[in-house]
From Swiss-Prot:
The gene is mcd4. This is GPI ethanolamine phosphate transferase 1. The keyword Signal does not apply. It comes from Aspergillus fumigatus (strain ATCC MYA-4609 / CBS 101355 / FGSC A1100 / Af293) (Neosartorya fumigata). Residues 994-1032 are annotated as: Disordered. The lineage of its organism: Eukaryota, Fungi, Dikarya, Ascomycota, Pezizomycotina. Glycans are attached at N150, N435, N810, N820. One of its GO terms (cellular component) is endoplasmic reticulum membrane. Its EC number is 2.-.-.-. Residues 1-6, 490-500, 545-564, 618-622, 669-688, 744-766, 863-884, 936-951 are cytoplasmic. Pfam families: Phosphodiest, PigN. It comes from the Eukaryota. Ethanolamine phosphate transferase involved in glycosylphosphatidylinositol-anchor biosynthesis. Transfers ethanolamine phosphate to the first alpha-1,4-linked mannose of the glycosylphosphatidylinositol precursor of GPI-anchor.
Length: 1032
């Protein structure tokens, strides 16, 4: 095929990584939902009643297990009580009384993503949706699978439209009633307890209406009915004020009081003691007011069950009690009562049993027998029915898998023959129950249930080896293809031709045809065909351009001839891999607080200029010192806590640094740029004044952002909500600061320092508005370090070029033709040099700084580590997509800054456009492939969430780098470096004569080649490498 150019390569990189990023969801997180199963319930004697006639489910959205049971100072003492009294009390006395005297309790462990939709689906359907379902709860997406609500005779529900609507629309028409409040009252900055009191009041209204409505009264008195109270107040309060705040703790008191009132109301209405109550939460809440990832604070929720059919508390006399060994509940004061932990999906099975319903057909929850008060026979029958439901799901999934594959290998423990057959297992358990033996059937049902889950797991992962092999070859093929393309475009300058043979064409075509035939027979989705096509395309291209790899090796490593040369090259390779592995080590640490590897790297990096000798440091003392200071300051941010508390003083310090930096540049711009003139435009007094006016407006926006942010924070902290005027001004500053830079086109100043200052001031207001702590300080230090890096890399480039010219006679580089090439940028033709091994260091530095831009203010686990408090200054009501967009905007700002700096560095080092970006994309997938094999879909919830984030961040990094390349083109279009750098090139020429210039052009070429190239080109000295007016 035709050789891809720069933009073709970048486009291919984006498409490939976007498609392959989705591969983990086709491999690790395939939806477990199947259809066509029959339902199972407990088979009772005719006339026998279910454990309860009705079920009441309370879900306290966002309630952490520890906060529900821990004692704490009263956050809202009653009138007449001492407000200064800090004696701890139990915030949920009614719930606690159920634990102590009436029911069974434990901790319900959720899975990632710890969001409302997946949590409620697990609770009510017994199903763990695949991870990609996280955002489906942000809009109406009916649950297209069975649930406890769907199995009920009728369900009444009250609460948030985000949860209730999806269960109502997904159930049998008319089976679920949903009474929902409007989304506009979900205001994170106001008193969220009103969301819960609204629900409690609506429940009271329903039962009050039944007294005068015989039809409603009759419906309420039927059996197998469910009442669902979704209590969103705690989640909203936790986001706005965090779970250790007085507001959150007060909300717990409100919920407890409301639950008591509703429980009493229902008991009095029916008067038959035939109601079962379940109190739990869909997910927890982290200390920084977020959820979504697998942190234990997000995955551990309370579970308290009481009422009809529920076992009472199990006390022991001075003996250790099972369930408290982990120490998590040590300060709850419940050590004398047995704690029964469950998986969240188990709650669905428990509710179905208590209400006398069939188990939801997609449920993987195991009935927790410790929670039920029943005879041994009833428990044995319930355990059997629960197991039959899961086995039915296994039977249907296996039949589907068997029909789709060319050759199917059955799951041996449940193979359809002899003693292992499902029917044989069920028959044996039924015989034992009929003979009056119950303990053994319960054990066997539990073992068979676990085997059935293993069988489902076997079917779920059946295609893993096949798919992971394809994906692995795809990533390895991309790495090889990318390196080949970089060598072809930027080392050989397209002088090597592709060469295919008949044999190779037949070989690769045959593999593709065989692969597609298998996929077609198995009726695979279209993504599988794309997954398979990429590795074949990449490896075929690498084979066809194998001569480019050989020629590139001779140019890049041809100078390594002696033993000492091999030792030096090996040492450089070890150092390169060590830094890359250090980044990998950072990701492999399964914790939120171990970012110190970046601190170590920055400290070591501060000594980097010394590697070029004392003479270099002496010539660039200020630059080297600034770099050391920048690295030292950057190293401190990864030592600061990830969990940040809103601190207006820290926000102010960062904003003032931004403001005074812009003001200083505005006042002394002529002095700073006095040695520079734009080669493309010589601004006069009017244009200079216009440029200063626009920049002055940018500086003013920084100050206005600080003022409105301080005002908004004060109002929000005082619980007065967000004033409308503040919201308007905040949005005005955000939008205006991003629009103002475009007016600089009217009065252009093309110096690269001026361009970087414009970018710095462009994003400063956004960073101020969306920061809650030290992020503004980080932004200032990060920008300072990047500018220093660009100048330092250029200084090293000039210094090493001058040194190689001085010692040209001893140059060990083999004599190769000087492959100087040209490119048209901004309508002008520029010459550029080919890449060398030293440029991989630049790519590695960029790679490291790119990651530090994210991890210096947060953790890798998920965006949930970034507080929502800053977003409330612009959007105080629940709007997940808009709020997430603002958080992502804040995360992307440092990346935009670094892209501009690398684009400038690309030109200062006189390499072709995109050359350095392409090198970065070539090496980044070493990390991506590492994380691909680290992805887990089982184990601890923290592990699952963290590994998903690892892979996606690494995978999108390459895509993001491609996007940054295009962004940098916009930012540095027409940029000029002034005559100072031209003077540097001239000084090299003056020092070493005519050879210096071409050495700078092509540091890999020997002096004779440089001279020949110069003569052939008809150019002199540094003019051989004209770029933006001849600058180096």
């Amino acid at each position: 095929m035709a050789r891809l150019g720069r933009f073709g390569f970048l486009a291919l990189a984006v498409v490939f990584h976007l498609i392959y990023a989705y591969s983990i969801f086709d491999i690790y997180f395939v939806s477990p939902i199947v259809s066509g199963m029959r339902s199972y319930g407990v088979e009772r004697e005719p006339g026998a009643k279910a454990p309860a006639s009705r079920l009441v489910l309370f879900v306290a959205d966002g309630l952490r297990a520890d906060k529900a049971f821990q004692p704490a100072p009263d956050p809202s003492p009653e009138d007449g009580e001492d407000a200064e009294n800090n004696d701890p009390i139990y915030l949920a006395p009614f719930i606690r009384s159920r634990v102590l005297s009436h029911g069974t309790f434990g901790v319900s462990h959720t899975r990632v993503p710890t969001e409302s939709r997946p949590g409620h689906v697990a609770l009510i359907a017994g199903l763990y949706e695949d991870v990609s379902a996280v955002t489906t709860g942000w809009k109406l997406n009916p649950v297209n699978f069975d649930s406890v609500f769907n199995q009920s005779r009728h369900t009444w529900s009250w609460g948030s439209p985000d949860i209730l609507a999806m269960f109502k629309e997904g159930a049998v028409p008319g089976r679920v009633d949903a009474d929902m409040y409007g989304e506009e009252i979900e205001d994170f900055t106001m008193d969220a307890t009103q969301l819960d009191t609204w629900v409690f009041n609506k429940v009271k209204e329903l039962f009050a209406s039944a007294k005068s409505d015989p039809e409603l009264d009759a419906k309420l008195r039927q059996d197998k009915v469910v009442f669902f109270l979704h209590l969103l107040g705690l989640d909203t309060t936790g986001h706005g004020y965090r779970p250790y705040s007085r507001e959150y703790l007060h909300n717990i008191k409100i919920v407890d009081k409301g639950v008591q009132e509703i429980a009493t109301l229902i008991e009095e209405f029916y008067g038959d003691d035939r109601t079962a109550f379940v109190f739990t939460a869909d997910h927890g809440m982290s200390d920084w007011g977020s959820h979504g990832d697998g942190h234990p604070d997000n995955t551990r929720t309370p579970l308290v069950v009481w009422g009809s059919g529920v076992a009472g508390p199990k006390y022991t006399d001075g003996k250790a009690v099972t369930g408290h060994e982990d120490g998590f509940s040590a300060d709850w004061g419940l050590d004398g009562i047995q704690r029964h932990d469950v998986a969240q999906a188990d709650v669905a099975a428990l509710m179905a049993y208590l209400a006398g319903l069939d188990f939801p057909v997609n449920s993987v929850g195991q009935l927790p027998l410790e929670y039920i008060d029943a005879s041994p026979k009833e428990k044995a029958l319930a355990a059997l029915a629960n197991t039959q439901e899961v086995l039915e799901m296994y039977r249907v999934k296996e039949a589907q898998k068997r029909a789709a594959l060319l050759r199917y290998k059955p799951f041996e423990p449940l193979a359809d023959h002899g003693k292992n057959s499902v029917e044989e297992h069920i028959a044996e358990i039924q015989v034992l129950i009929a003979n009056g033996s119950y303990d053994e059937p319960i054990k066997r049902s539990g073992a068979l249930f676990a085997t059935a889950l293993e069988g489902l797991r076997y079917l779920q992962t059946y295609d893993w080896l096949f798919l992971r092999t394809i994906i692995t070859f795809g990533y390895l093929g991309w790495i090889a293809y990318a390196l080949t393309t970089v060598i072809d475009l930027h080392v050989l300058h397209r002088t090597s031709d592709s060469k295919r043979t008949v044999g190779s064409t037949i070989f690769f075509t045959s593999i593709l045809a065989a692969l597609f035939s298998v996929l077609l027979y198995q009726k695979s989705s279209w993504q599988y065909y794309v997954y398979g096509a990429f590795p074949i395309f990449f490896w075929e291209e690498v084979f066809a351009r194998r001569k480019a790899l050989i020629a590139g090796r001779e140019i890049l490593l041809g100078h390594v001839r002696s033993f000492g040369g091999y030792i030096a090259s090996g040492f450089q390779l070890v150092a390169f891999v060590a830094v890359l592995e250090a980044l990998l080590m950072r990701h492999q640490v399964q914790s939120y607080f171990h970012r110190e590897i970046y601190t170590v790297c920055f400290v070591l990096g501060s000594f980097w200029p010394i590697l070029y000798g004392v003479d270099f440091v002496r010539q660039n003392t200020v630059l080297s010192a600034t770099w050391a200071v920048g690295c030292s300051l950057m190293s401190t941010f990864t030592l600061l806590p990830v969990i940040k508390v809103e601190n207006i003083n820290t926000i102010t310090y960062g904003a003032l640094l931004m403001f005074f930096t812009g003001l200083f540049y505005l006042l002394f711009e002529d002095t700073i740029l006095k040695h520079s003139k734009s080669s493309g435009h010589a601004p006069g007094a009017i244009s200079s004044l216009g440029s200063r006016v626009i920049m002055g407006m940018q500086v003013g926006m920084v100050l206005l952002a600080l003022i409105v942010t301080r005002s908004s924070v004060s109002s929000l902290q005082a619980k007065q909500g967000l004033p409308f005027g503040n919201q308007v001004v905040g949005w005005f500053v955000l939008v205006a600061s991003l629009v103002l830079p475009f007016f600089h086109r009217l009065y252009p100043n093309s110096h690269y320092l001026h361009r970087l200052m414009v970018l710095f001031l462009t994003f400063s207001p956004t960073f101020i508005i969306l920061t809650i702590s030290y992020e503004g300080l980080f932004y200032f230090v990060f920008c300072m370090t990047l500018v220093t890096w660009v100048r330092l890399e250029h200084a090293i480039y000039v210094y090493t070029a001058r040194s190689s010219a001085h010692y040209g006679g001893n140059n060990t580089v083999p004599k190769k033709p000087g492959l100087n090439a040209t490119a048209v940028i901004d309508g002008q033709e520029y010459r550029y040099r080919r890449l060398g091994l030293a440029d991989t260091r630049v790519a590695l530095f960029f790679f490291f700084l790119l990651q530090s831009a994210f991890f210096s203010t947060g953790n890798i686990a998920s965006v949930s580590s970034f507080s929502l408090e800053s977003v409330f200054r612009l959007i105080p009501v629940f709007s997940p997509f808009s709020q997430s967009a603002l958080l992502i905007l804040k995360l992307l700002i440092p990346f935009a800054i670094i892209s501009a700096n690398l684009g400038i560095l690309n030109r200062r080092l006189e390499v072709a456009p995109s050359a350095l970006f392409m090198v970065v994309m070539s090496i980044s997938d070493v990390m991506t492939l590492n994380f691909f094999y680290m992805v887990r879909d089982e184990g601890s919830w923290l592990d699952i969430g963290t590994t998903i984030s690892h892979f996606l961040i690494a995978s999108f990094l390459c895509t993001f780098v491609a996007g940054l390349e295009f962004l940098s083109e916009v930012f540095i279009s027409g940029v000029d470096f002034g005559p100072t750098t031209k003077a540097i090139g001239a000084s090299i020429t003056k020092t070493v004569g005519g050879t210096a210039g071409s050495d700078v052009v092509d540091s890999q070429s020997g002096p004779e080649d440089a001279a020949n190239s110069k003569k052939a080109e008809g150019l002199e000295g540094s003019e051989t490498i004209r770029q933006n007016g001849g600058s180096v």
